[in-house]
Amino acid sequence: MAAAVAMETDDAGNRLRFQLELEFVQCLANPNYLNFLAQRGYFKDKAFVNYLKYLLYWKEPEYAKYLKYPQCLHMLELLQYEHFRKELVNAQCAKFIDEQQILHWQHYSRKRVRLQQALAEQQQQNNTAGK
């Protein structure tokens, strides 16, 4: 009986840890949040830097599939470099990253729409050729 209760407690604890780490990793996609962390000295704390290294497991497909903001993995990778962490103290650096993300999303959206249109046209041609 006690073993079953302990197992349920472990499962609940693991689920909570998963949710908290998922939320935190996704916050790393926000350059303004990274600037906030840098200005408050989090990136100078060796334990915090080690935690960022630990979080690299989110790059594995079995975990990455839960991410809504995959660019957070790129930021997590960049945060492994001390030079990048130091640059984030500068608000202009965060602003630049933010602008680059917006440009990427705009370009990606347009490119994706064109690709979907081309695939739909190709499928329509294949359907009419098959009749």
UniProtKB/Swiss-Prot annotation:
Family matches, as InterPro entries: Med31_sf, Mediator_Med31
Localization of this protein: Nucleus
Parts forming coiled coils: none
GO cellular component terms, semicolon-separated: core mediator complex; mediator complex; nucleoplasm; nucleus; ubiquitin ligase complex
N-acetylalanine modified-residue sites: 2
GO molecular function list: transcription coregulator activity; ubiquitin protein ligase activity
UniProt keyword annotations, A-Z: Acetylation, Activator, Nucleus, Transcription, Transcription regulation
One Pfam family it belongs to: Med31
GO BP annotations, alphabetical order: limb development; negative regulation of fibroblast proliferation; positive regulation of transcription elongation by RNA polymerase II; positive regulation of transcription initiation by RNA polymerase II; protein ubiquitination; RNA polymerase II preinitiation complex assembly
General function of this protein: Component of the Mediator complex, a coactivator involved in the regulated transcription of nearly all RNA polymerase II-dependent genes. Mediator functions as a bridge to convey information from gene-specific regulatory proteins to the basal RNA polymerase II transcription machinery. Mediator is recruited to promoters by direct interactions with regulatory proteins and serves as a scaffold for the assembly of a functional preinitiation complex with RNA polymerase II and the general transcription factors.
Subunit annotation: Component of the Mediator complex, which is composed of MED1, MED4, MED6, MED7, MED8, MED9, MED10, MED11, MED12, MED13, MED13L, MED14, MED15, MED16, MED17, MED18, MED19, MED20, MED21, MED22, MED23, MED24, MED25, MED26, MED27, MED29, MED30, MED31, CCNC, CDK8 and CDC2L6/CDK11. The MED12, MED13, CCNC and CDK8 subunits form a distinct module termed the CDK8 module. Mediator containing the CDK8 module is less active than Mediator lacking this module in supporting transcriptional activation.
Family (UniProt): Belongs to the Mediator complex subunit 31 family.
Name of the protein in question: Mediator of RNA polymerase II transcription subunit 31
